[in-house]
Design a protein with these regions (language model features):
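Alpha-helical transmembrane segments and their helix-helix packing motifs
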Residues: 1-230
Length: 230
């Protein structure tokens, strides 16, 4: 048995056991994962806006780097993130360690509570001083406008490539032994997909909800429920 199989089988068993034993605890861990990514998204937005006043070209670099820290939070604090679970659980199902029906149930449950966590933190951040002073020139407005302006094909292909980067981050963190190397591979892989503006479901929960609770949402013409769901 390879090291990958050992790690995946152990992770699947742990996740399934937690889900079976306590839906409440699993929901809380899922909410925290959504919250961690919303935290790093919020800080990244403010950081990008501040750096844009002096060196606009660095805004994307700043946001991508700060956002990546959110995934490190998820990994260190053992949050349940839907996109990382897609790798663990589908691999476990492929090897026959967990039923496909259970995989789908856990993923749907995890995704829903990732959204709840993002929703709650987005509301809280929008009560803060920093988010009360966002303008229609904010990085948040630009980022969401770009995302909602993409074609369905772009969303499909970029969703795949984003998950490839996330998988690399999770695999590196799981297989490497040196802590500094684990953090570097996680940060670098996530930085890359964010810098490319690829589509990540939970990251979109964060950015859309942060904008949705803010008055500058009116600056995004295509910020509609139908377009968001697309």
């Amino acid at each position: 048995m390879s090291q990958f199989q050992e790690k995946v089988f152990a992770a699947c068993a742990k996740k399934e056991a937690l889900f079976n034993e306590s839906l409440g605890r699993y929901a809380l861990r899922s909410m925290l994962a959504g919250a961690y990514l919303t935290m790093s998204t919020a800080v990244g937005i403010i950081g990008a806006d501040i750096i844009a006043t002096g060196i606009p070209a660095l805004s994307r670099f700043v946001f991508a780097f700060i956002f990546a820290i959110g995934l490190v939070f998820v990994l260190i604090f053992d949050g349940e993130l839907a996109t990382s679970n897609m790798m663990f659980l589908t691999s476990g199902a492929y090897y026959g360690k967990i039923k496909w029906s259970k995989v789908c149930t856990i993923l749907l449950y995890c995704t829903f509570f990732n959204f709840v966590g993002a929703l709650i933190l987005a509301w809280f951040f929008n009560q803060s001083f920093s988010f009360h002073h966002l303008t229609d020139k904010s990085f948040l407005v630009t980022a969401v406008s770009t995302k909602l302006g993409k074609t369905d094909w772009m969303n499909f292909t970029e969703g795949i490539t984003a998950n490839m980067f996330v998988t690399l981050a999770i695999l590196g963190y799981m297989l490497l032994k040196e802590e500094s190397a684990k953090i570097f591979i996680a940060l670098s892989a996530i930085f890359m997909f964010v810098f490319l503006v690829n589509e990540h479901l939970i990251a979109n929960f964060a950015s859309f909800m942060l904008l949705g609770f803010n008055g500058v949402r009116d600056a995004v013409d295509n910020f509609t429920l139908a377009n968001i769901l697309r």
